[in-house]
Amino acid sequence: MNACASASSLHSLSPAVAPQEPYLLEVLNVSKGFPGVVALANVQLRVRPGTVLALMGENGAGKSTLMKIIAGIYQPDSGELRLKGRPVTFATPLAALQAGIAMIHQELNLMPHMSIAENIWIGREQQNRLGLIDHREMHRCTAALLARLRIELDPEEQVGNLSIAERQMVEIAKAVSYDSDVLIMDEPTSAITDKEVAHLFSIIADLKAQGKGIVYITHKMNEVFAIADEVAVFRDGAYIGLQRADSLDGDSLISMMVGRELSQLFPLREKPIGELLLKVRDLRLDGVFKGVSFDLHAGEILGIAGLMGSGRTNVAETLFGITPSDGGEIVLDGQPLRIGDPHRAIEKGLALLTEDRKLSGLFPCLSVLENMEVAVLPHYAGGGFVQQKALRALCEDMCRKLRVKTPSLEQCIDTLSGGNQQKALLARWLMTQPRILILDEPTRGIDVGAKAEIYRLIASLAGEGMAVIMISSELPEVLGMSDRVMVMHEGQLMGTLDRNEATQERVMQLASGLN
């Protein structure tokens, strides 16, 4: 089937034909190790046609490692994969794709300087009679695919100009374009809005009707019970079990995942009464946001809520000097402050954990140690020498405090799970000893156990007098952690709510532009 034909197969959804084999995909006793770490130990998994299998587990449980084995990125040390009952081995991701397995990665893998059409059909470009790439035909195929998926994007738009949510939809379109029997979705909703989640779920329902098998990795309980037929749980590299989704509730699923009962997810805190640290008045960035005013006190957690495109992240980046403001006033410790670049912000005690760790946080080719030390390196260097022993001791201490799971500090950070990468980045900024910590989506892609750890850490930092600004798309997180909640809509501050008046209904009302 050619590229356009595979795309058009979504157009008419005929009832799935029951296959002779009971399973599309089987994983039998697969093991995989890395230096100093057993990532998988004799795990198993089975995917039925026309079903969604949710794969759950804490960060480091082995979920992503197994998916990379299925997708041909890693090779297993032992065990067997079967596709429609036949043993298979995939030496490369291309081999897995050609066999009918497509994967949507948690960290998006698109070419930013290429168009949407070029990204979707890369390696499968339509050619004309002269053997040249037929850009017109590629455009037509892409437009047809996007239309059938109800994705409103221009096929010729450069991917680098898209939002994270739009890039995620392009990844989904690309995976669907292969007409694969098995689709692996690794945290597909981590960066998209509730409306786009509903859109994705409708696409998944269409794929189920065609007899496709979906492996759906997520940390969001509500999604599991909304979309999954079965749930498989991994813990510490081991397969714990598989159950029908309708036979589980949230507490039993969490218990399977973490091997223990979780205490209250959001720590109980008394509202702090600290000194005024930061005063912002009428802050604006032309064409992006305007009229943003707020106060921030020591020991306070200020949440910022809003839909995607509301300007939340832009406010954080302006406060940190990434995009200097076009007007307004920032006052720190009673003194007017102009923050023209991140170096100035760090000097004044600000730190920013960005929303996209791959794009603007990690140095993927460097070690855990090198990624953690980069923000404090100037303080440990002088006279042509670096105080390596002191730096290592500091990084080791932060790894222990934040429970960063890594075989060693020399390990390439790109090999860690998403949650451990996030904790390493948080450690980087805590080593600068900030007075104001700005967190943009701090628990995106992190499992429920790790979330509880992050929440306790944030509460502890606030209890020690640190001021925290927390941006999040998860309303329970904003409401559960914040002393006050700012709500933005299309670049405007709609209101600031105290904890006792901040409800999901009221926040969503303001986030939608309704007073």
Curated annotation (Swiss-Prot):
Location(s), subcellular: Cell inner membrane
Binding site for ATP: 57-64
Pfam family, one: ABC_tran
Gene Ontology MF terms: ABC-type D-ribose transporter activity; ATP binding; ATP hydrolysis activity
Domain of life of the native organism: Bacteria
Topology in the lipid bilayer: Peripheral membrane protein
The ABC transporter domain, residue ranges: 25-261, 268-515
InterPro entries: AAA+_ATPase, ABC_carbohydrate_import_ATPase, ABC_transporter-like_ATP-bd, ABC_transporter-like_CS, P-loop_NTPase
Keyword terms: ATP-binding, Cell inner membrane, Cell membrane, Membrane, Nucleotide-binding, Repeat, Sugar transport, Translocase, Transport
Main location per the UniProt record: membrane
Catalytic activity: D-ribose(out) + ATP + H2O = D-ribose(in) + ADP + phosphate + H(+); D-galactose(out) + ATP + H2O = D-galactose(in) + ADP + phosphate + H(+)
SUPFAM superfamilies in UniProt: P-loop containing nucleoside triphosphate hydrolases
CDD domains referenced in this protein's UniProt entry, alphabetically: ABC_Carb_Monos_I, ABC_Carb_Monos_II
GO cellular component, one term: plasma membrane
EC number from the UniProt entry: 7.5.2.11, 7.5.2.7
PANTHER family on file: CARBOHYDRATE TRANSPORT ATP-BINDING PROTEIN MG119-RELATED (PTHR43790), GALACTOSE_METHYL GALACTOSIDE IMPORT ATP-BINDING PROTEIN MGLA (PTHR43790:SF7)
Family classification: Belongs to the ABC transporter superfamily. Carbohydrate importer 2 (CUT2) (TC 3.A.1.2) family.
Physiological role: Part of an ABC transporter complex involved in carbohydrate import. Could be involved in ribose, galactose and/or methyl galactoside import. Responsible for energy coupling to the transport system.
Protein name, as recorded: Putative ribose/galactose/methyl galactoside import ATP-binding protein
Organism whose genome encodes this protein: Pseudomonas fluorescens (strain ATCC BAA-477 / NRRL B-23932 / Pf-5)
